[in-house]
UniProtKB/Swiss-Prot annotation:
Requisite cofactors: Zn(2+)
General function of this protein: Involved in base excision repair of DNA damaged by oxidation or by mutagenic agents. Acts as a DNA glycosylase that recognizes and removes damaged bases. Has a preference for oxidized purines, such as 7,8-dihydro-8-oxoguanine (8-oxoG). Has AP (apurinic/apyrimidinic) lyase activity and introduces nicks in the DNA strand. Cleaves the DNA backbone by beta-delta elimination to generate a single-strand break at the site of the removed base with both 3'- and 5'-phosphates.
Biological-process GO terms, alphabetical: base-excision repair
Keywords: DNA damage, DNA repair, DNA-binding, Glycosidase, Hydrolase, Lyase, Metal-binding, Multifunctional enzyme, Zinc, Zinc-finger
Alphabetical list of InterPro entries matching this protein: DNA_glyclase/AP_lyase_DNA-bd, Formamido-pyr_DNA_Glyclase, FPG_cat, MutM-like_N-ter, Ribosomal_uS13-like_H2TH, Znf_DNA_glyclase/AP_lyase
Catalytically driven reaction(s): Hydrolysis of DNA containing ring-opened 7-methylguanine residues, releasing 2,6-diamino-4-hydroxy-5-(N-methyl)formamidopyrimidine; 2'-deoxyribonucleotide-(2'-deoxyribose 5'-phosphate)-2'-deoxyribonucleotide-DNA = a 3'-end 2'-deoxyribonucleotide-(2,3-dehydro-2,3-deoxyribose 5'-phosphate)-DNA + a 5'-end 5'-phospho-2'-deoxyribonucleoside-DNA + H(+)
Zinc fingers (FPG-type) by residue: 250-290
Family (UniProt): Belongs to the FPG family.
Subunit annotation: Monomer.
SMART domains per record: Fapy_DNA_glyco, H2TH
Molecular function GO labels: 8-oxo-7,8-dihydroguanine DNA N-glycosylase activity; class I DNA-(apurinic or apyrimidinic site) endonuclease activity; damaged DNA binding; zinc ion binding
Name of this chain's protein: Formamidopyrimidine-DNA glycosylase
Residues at the catalytic site: 2-3, 58, 280
Length: 290
């Protein structure tokens, strides 16, 4: 599933192309994804101007102007396999898993606009369209925790949110009400960099441990964004290119390999271990992470 770095990468790629552009044509090829699409979705989008693109947690938020309803927000969640790819028009025939295609007006001095295609093989993504005034109260956004790259996320705030939690720290960090946007890959990588075991009880991650974990999270996310995210299965950037952060994984997907943090001997120690927590694979070094 695309996590914060992948969604942020897509946001930046789309922003460079479609910010300020008008949606002149919108083609919708099915009535639903994970949930039903909004009523009159394509008709309501057509003719609106893209005023800006933002991200909250794993959600892409597109601000639209020009509607009789007032400013609108188009919320996009990519689910497990959703992609948004932009290219020069005109649009061709839709592929078997292309569910929404929109075309913009041409940028100044150019003959063709941009065509953006939403493709989703598993159809686990979803979209919504609602008045901007309802943004903070939207059910998908209202209870989210702080942004890990924002000014409101520091060791003190993380310690406060983890206080009293007796779940493993891995599960706590995946809780979107604790911190927004983290997923399995980046939690594994962040805990490794901080030297914290994913089995450790969340409430014990305070003080110096929280002081190590917060910059580790920030560094992992920042580096992943710079690399265009991680392409393991379906994810591609908005230009159709793969992300490259998967080549920088220290522990994720590296079961049985030597730990880059302690150079342990896999024959003697087993190297990087894989365990299952809450139904998800966790990768870590039991010797390096405590």
């Amino acid at each position: 599933m695309p996590e914060l770095p992948e969604v942020e990468t897509v946001r930046r790629g789309l922003e460079m192309k479609i910010a300020g552009r008008v949606l002149v044509r919108v083609a919708q090829y099915r009535p639903d994804l994970r949930f039903p699409l909004p009523e009159r979705f394509a008709a309501r989008l057509t003719g609106l101007r893209v005023a800006g693109l933002f991200r909250r947690a794993k959600y892409l938020l597109i601000r639209l102007e020009g509607s009789a309803e007032g400013p609108l927000v188009w919320l996009v969640h990519l689910g497990m396999s959703g992609t948004l790819v932009v290219r020069r028009g005109p649009p061709g025939p839709p592929g078997p898993h292309d569910h929404l295609v929109f075309e913009t007006d041409p940028p100044p001095g150019e003959a063709q606009g941009w065509v953006v295609t939403y493709n989703d093989v598993r159809r686990f993504g979803f979209m919504d369209l609602f008045p901007e005034a309802l943004l903070d109260s939207h059910p998908m956004l209202a209870c989210l925790g702080p942004e890990p790259l924002g000014n409101g996320f520091d060791a003190e705030e993380l310690s406060r949110r983890l206080a009293g939690k007796i779940t493993p720290i891995k599960a706590a960090l995946l809780d979107q009400t604790v911190v927004a946007g983290l997923g399995n890959i980046y939690v594994c990588e962040s805990l490794f960099r901080a030297g914290i075991s994913p089995r450790r009880l969340a409430h014990t991650v305070a003080g110096r441990r929280a002081g190590r974990l917060v910059p580790a999270i920030r560094d992992v996310l920042t580096e992943a964004i710079a690399a265009g995210g991680s392409s393991l299965r379906d994810y591609v950037q908005s230009d159709g290119e793969l992300g490259y952060f998967q080549h920088s994984f220290k522990v994720y997907g590296r079961e049985g390999e030597p730990c880059p943090g302690c150079d342990c001997d896999p024959v003697r120690t087993g190297g990087i271990a894989r365990i299952v927590q809450s139904g998800r694979s966790t990768f870590y070094c039991p010797r390096h992470q405590r």
